[in-house]
């Protein structure tokens, strides 16, 4: 008998059935498929193999929460997630399709680099308060409208 009694037991959380207690952590930016097309198939396959290997849930890695204040490294343009028939949405959906094909739950890791964001143009660090970081970089304060974008 395993000393991890429940590791391989299914469980239900908020109506979603996890086939076991194993969750694959993210390993690469989800948005890498947008900006490094030459590695896209390898990234999709890496994520798919985790689902195929038996994980109950698989993360795709970071995807920025918005295209203004929530930009992140390697983001060369805005990602359009509003057009469900558009290429950007299809590229993210490809992760979910490959993961779900093997019976695992797919999830995205949303990211917002906040006050520690990259400072090279077009990146600007945004945080809960305005201040100057130790490295001399100005951090701008998010306003209520900016914060509400995450809840849309």
Question: What is each model feature region?
Answer:
Residues 1-152:
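Flavin-dependent oxidoreductase catalytic cores
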């Amino acid at each position: 008998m395993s000393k991890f009694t429940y590791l391989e037991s299914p469980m239900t959380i908020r109506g979603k059935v996890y086939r076991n207690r194993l969750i694959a952590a993210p390993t690469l930016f989800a948005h890498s498929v947008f900006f490094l097309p030459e590695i896209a198939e390898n990234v999709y396959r890496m994520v798919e193999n985790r689902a195929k290997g038996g994980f109950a849930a698989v993360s795709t890695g970071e995807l920025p929460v918005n295209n203004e204040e929530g930009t992140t490294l390697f983001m060369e343009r805005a990602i359009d997630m509003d057009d469900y028939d558009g290429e950007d949405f299809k590229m993210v959906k490809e992760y979910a399709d490959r993961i779900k094909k093997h019976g695992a739950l797919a999830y995205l890791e949303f990211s917002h680099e906040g006050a520690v964001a990259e400072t090279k143009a077009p990146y600007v660090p945004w945080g809960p308060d305005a201040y100057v970081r130790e490295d001399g970089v100005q951090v701008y304060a998010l306003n209520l409208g900016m914060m509400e974008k995450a809840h849309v």
